[in-house]
From Swiss-Prot:
Gene3D superfamilies for the chain: Farnesyl Diphosphate Synthase, Terpene synthase, N-terminal domain
Organism: Salvia miltiorrhiza
Domain notes: The Asp-Asp-Xaa-Xaa-Asp/Glu (DDXXD/E) motif is important for the catalytic activity, presumably through binding to Mg(2+).
Gene Ontology annotations of biological process type: diterpenoid biosynthetic process; sesquiterpenoid biosynthetic process
Role played: Sesquiterpene synthase that catalyzes the conversion of farnesyl diphosphate to (-)-5-epi-eremophilene.
Name by which UniProt lists this protein: (-)-5-epieremophilene synthase STPS1
Pfam families: Terpene_synth, Terpene_synth_C
The enzyme's E.C. designation: 4.2.3.199
Top-rank lineage group of the source organism: Eukaryota
InterPro entries documented for this protein: Isoprenoid_synthase_dom_sf, Terpene_cyclase-like_1_C, Terpene_cyclase_plant_C1, Terpene_synth_N, Terpene_synth_N_sf, Terpene_synthase-like, Terpene_synthase_metal-bd, Terpenoid_cyclase/PrenylTrfase
Family to which this protein belongs: Belongs to the terpene synthase family. Tpsa subfamily.
Residues that hold Mg(2+) 2 according to the record: 299, 303
Pathway membership: Secondary metabolite biosynthesis; terpenoid biosynthesis
Gene it is expressed from: STPS1
């Protein structure tokens, strides 16, 4: 007797519905308001350009201005000028052992140079080490300097013991003195201890810093007004894009056709915006949002609905990548398969016009690799098989989706050439580091939920069995893996590099999204209410008051 749909036992996950409904479809970004903001921003840009010029060769003044521009989220208007200044200052090879440079200043300069790829030595912090090899006790009263040191230490690479010690010292001391600091420094410290700047989403960090800068007695009113106007102007653009992808998603009607899957188009756009927020990446954001949304459905089909016979057929259909395969598929997944292939047909047509049709090819091949790995995991689950950790990790580095999302993040980036896609396809060190962070942080956040759903082949379980470890030891090891991987990413971002900084920043920013989404060991994508909702409201709903 044939098995009916009613008889099939499915691993239903019962995901929560979207928090947003049609909110962003009904939203009117306001073209007139955007035009008004645009004119004001252009005027203020001239003022800021004059400030950059006026700073001239004054190292301390110029570096403080650059830091303020970056933290207010407006530095993208002056990338060329900032890069030129930083290159000039770095080549001066300043002697930071000079007592006139305090801890705040040295830490700030170190962080800015490293953020922009300049290979400045961490030995410059040696003058604050005492005879016992520890940071001097007298620093514990310097809250501003310690915060600057704390933020700088996150740019560390492997083997930089002085920065490992700096982070440990600064973290412990800031936690101790935070309640006794005055605002706005106290607010900065509390925020930084939760979300280090280097790991944070640039737009979220800009939103936070604008409110802190407003409290600063030494604030520059021009910069503050510029930052607020620019933030609201970018928000209008992002709302337009979110409106477009929300309409696309609603027209596909996959929410009603595939009710088992997570309805997270808004959260997917949040991820895409985290990869690149600047106006010139508008098309790239829309393309990436669509690919993330479709991947989410594939993930849920393998992880939370499909049975192995169906998944065998679906895996083969993706491998063949032909519309003729649709009729072989289970009826429920046919509309999705059709929509997926049509989406990539649109991408191919659009990219062919600019001579970049190869980009779609690399994305499709990466998706096939992802689906093959999902299929392996599904078979493990059905068989109740717990693989050795090494075997688990090899497959799980692909199913974390980071490899595919990195590839598709370049679809709409015109400067991304075929060599960049080939580089990613060969799994370079920086990408592998990103895969590791994504995998272990996701595993920590989702372990308990997956265990409740009967998932045996989890990374935590595999590591615990192989190493006879407790869950606490496994989690500690996973955080250690993530920490070392971040050091590798920092190293790979330093010059000289044969690869485009535009491409490297996509990998870095995707990593930052992971840090934000899984903050506090929460799965902010599956359950966005606590972690992502406040960020989405700040970024896409509420403008900053002028």
């Amino acid at each position: 007797m044939a098995t009916t749909q009613a008889q099939i036992q499915r691993p239903i996950a019962n995901f929560s519905p979207s928090l947003w409904g049609d909110q962003f479809i009904k939203n009117d970004p306001g073209a007139k308001a955007a035009e008004k903001h645009c004119k004001a921003v252009e005027e203020l840009k001239k003022e800021v350009m004059n400030m950059i010029t006026a700073a001239g060769s004054n190292l301390v003044e110029a570096m403080n201005l650059i830091d303020t521009l970056e933290r207010l989220g407006i530095s993208y208007h002056f990338e060329k000028e900032i890069d030129q200044k930083l290159k000039h200052f770095f080549n001066l090879n300043k002697d930071y052992s000079d007592e006139s440079y305090d801890l705040y200043t040295v830490s700030l300069h170190f962080r800015l140079f490293r953020q922009h790829g300049h290979r400045i030595s961490s030995d410059i912090f040696g003058r604050w080490i005492d005879e016992s090899g520890k940071f001097k006790e007298g620093l514990k009263t310097d809250g501003k300097g310690l915060l600057s040191l704390y933020e700088a230490s996150y740019l560390r690479t492997r083997g930089e013991t002085i920065l490992d010690d700096a982070l440990e010292f600064a973290t412990a001391t800031l936690n101790s003195i935070a309640p006794h600091l005055e605002s706005p420094l106290s607010k900065q410290v509390v925020h930084a201890l939760i979300q280090p700047l280097h790991y944070g989403n640039p737009r979220i960090e800009a939103h936070n810093f604008i409110s802190i800068y407003e409290e600063n007695q030494d604030k520059n009113e021009f910069l503050l007004r510029f930052a607020k106007l620019d933030y609201n102007l970018l928000q209008m653009l992002h709302k337009e894009e979110l409106n477009e992808v929300s309409r696309w998603w609603k027209e596909l009607d996959l929410v009603s056709k595939l009710p088992y899957a997570r309805d997270r188009v808004v959260e997917c756009f949040f991820w895409a915006m985290g990869v690149y927020h600047e106006p010139q990446y508008s098309r790239a954001r829309i393309m990436l949002t669509k690919t993330i949304t479709m991947t989410s459905i594939i993930d849920d089909t393998y992880d939370a609905y499909g049975v192995i016979e169906e998944l065998d057929i679906f895996t083969e259909a993706i491998e063949r990548w032909n519309m003729e395969e649709m009729k072989k598929l289970p009826e429920y997944i046919q509309p999705f398969y059709k929509a997926l292939l049509e989406l990539y047909e649109q991408f191919e047509e659009e990219l062919a016009e600019e001579g970049r049709s190869y980009a779609a090819h690399y994305a499709i091949e990466s998706l096939k690799e992802l689906v093959r790995s999902y299929h392996v995991e599904a078979k493990w689950f059905i068989q109740g098989y717990l693989p050795p950790f090494e075997e688990y990790l090899k497959n799980a580095l692909i199913t974390c989706t980071y490899c595919y999302h990195t590839t598709t993040s370049l679809l709409g980036v015109e400067s991304a050439v075929e060599e960049d896609f080939e580089w990613l396809a060969n799994k370079p060190k920086m990408l592998v580091a990103g895969l590791l962070i994504c995998r272990v942080i996701d595993d920590i956040a989702t372990y308990e939920v997956e265990k409740e759903r009967g998932q045996s082949a989890t990374g935590i379980e595999s590591y615990m069995r192989d190493n006879n470890a407790t869950i606490e030891e496994a989690v500690a090891k996973f955080f250690e893996i993530a920490t070392d991987a971040w050091k590798d990413i920092n190293e790979e971002c330093l010059m000289p590099s044969p690869y485009s900084r535009d491409v490297l920043m996509r990998i870095l920013n995707l990593e930052r999204i992971i840090d934000v989404t899984y903050k506090g060991n929460e799965d902010g994508y599956t359950q966005p209410e606590k972690v992502l909702k406040p960020h989405i409201i700040a970024l896409f709903v509420d403008p900053i008051k002028m």
